């Protein structure tokens, strides 16, 4: 049995006061095995981002427990939670959030500096090498394409060698070809032993995952293993009550992989 990288137990996240309370998450229990790629999907307001933020320690649940490996996040102080995020978790968002005055190398080194560690150039260049941008180390964001900037953001997330990488629509601002390149990098990182959890609206992006979780009204209502873009889109269409067609560009199929068995 593959050990869980992340576990949620009866996690609830409520907003507002009694009488006008809204549940962003409603009694969610979930296990995400190590070295797997999980996509999270659902309509707007379904709880996707809330699930990601609570799982990554960016938001505190109203109830329940969240574990990263053997560490329970819900009981940690803000200081310890910040230290854990900086050392054991990586983040990639739709917005690249690179500092325009810094080079790619300097942007990638930022998490190490924030953690109070002196960046080793070899470690920073290794992260850039992983995303194929070592030769662009001295370029500033304005000198890079959108896809290259997102790859720098990915290298920045990887430089601390995190246990789990979280992505919130990481390809949402990219064209389909560039987005497939970033998704291929995420897939290769999972194949190398990392754990990736990604929120997306895109069936093609979700097809790179091992498992897709579908949320509605703060609950996990379905899941799909070894997904294809067509199967994901069909599931979304049933949820929306509409018929959608997948217009995946040529060559958009995810790389072949063994089908994971539910566990």
Language model features: what each stretch is:
Residues 19-22, 73-90, 114, 191, ...:
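ABC ATPase NBD coupling module
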Residues 176-178:
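Helix N-cap at the start of a conserved alpha-helix in ABC-type nucleotide-binding domains
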Residues 161:
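Conserved catalytic motifs of ABC-family nucleotide-binding domains
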Residues 64-72:
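Conserved ABC transporter NBD signature motif
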Residues 140-150:
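Conserved ABC ATPase signature
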Residues 165-168:
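Catalytic Walker B motif of ABC-type/P-loop ATPase nucleotide-binding domains
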Residues 102-110:
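Short coil-to-helix segment of the ABC ATPase nucleotide-binding domain corresponding to the Q-loop/switch region
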């Amino acid at each position: 049995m593959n050990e869980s990288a992340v576990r949620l137990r009866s996690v609830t996240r409520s907003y507002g006061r009694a009488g006008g309370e809204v549940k962003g998450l409603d009694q969610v229990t979930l296990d995400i095995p190590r070295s797997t790629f999980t996509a999270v999907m659902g309509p707007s307001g379904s709880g996707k981002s809330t699930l990601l933020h609570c799982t990554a320690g960016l938001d505190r649940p109203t109830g329940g427990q969240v574990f990263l490996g053997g560490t329970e996040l819900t009981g940690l102080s803000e200081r310890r939670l910040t230290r854990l995020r900086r050392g054991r978790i990586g983040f990639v968002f739709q917005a690249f959030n690179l500092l325009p005055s810094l080079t790619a190398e300097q942007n990638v080194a930022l998490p190490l500096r924030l953690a109070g560690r002196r960046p080793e150039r070899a470690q920073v260049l290794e992260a850039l090498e992983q995303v194929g941008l070592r030769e662009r180390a001295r370029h500033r964001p304005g000198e890079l394409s959108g896809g290259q900037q997102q790859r720098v953001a990915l290298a920045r997330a990887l430089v601390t060698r995190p246990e789990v990488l979280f992505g919130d629509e990481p390809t949402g601002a990219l064209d389909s070809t560039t987005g497939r390149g970033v998704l291929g990098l995420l897939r290769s990182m999972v194949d190398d032993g990392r754990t990736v959890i990604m929120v997306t609206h895109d069936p093609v992006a979700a097809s790179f995952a091992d498992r897709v979780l579908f949320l509605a009204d703060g609950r996990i209502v379905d899941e799909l293993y070894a997904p294809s873009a067509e199967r994901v889109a069909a599931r979304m269409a049933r949820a929306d009550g509409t018929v959608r067609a997948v217009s995946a560009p040529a060559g958009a199929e995810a790389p072949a992989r063994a089908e994971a068995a539910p566990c």
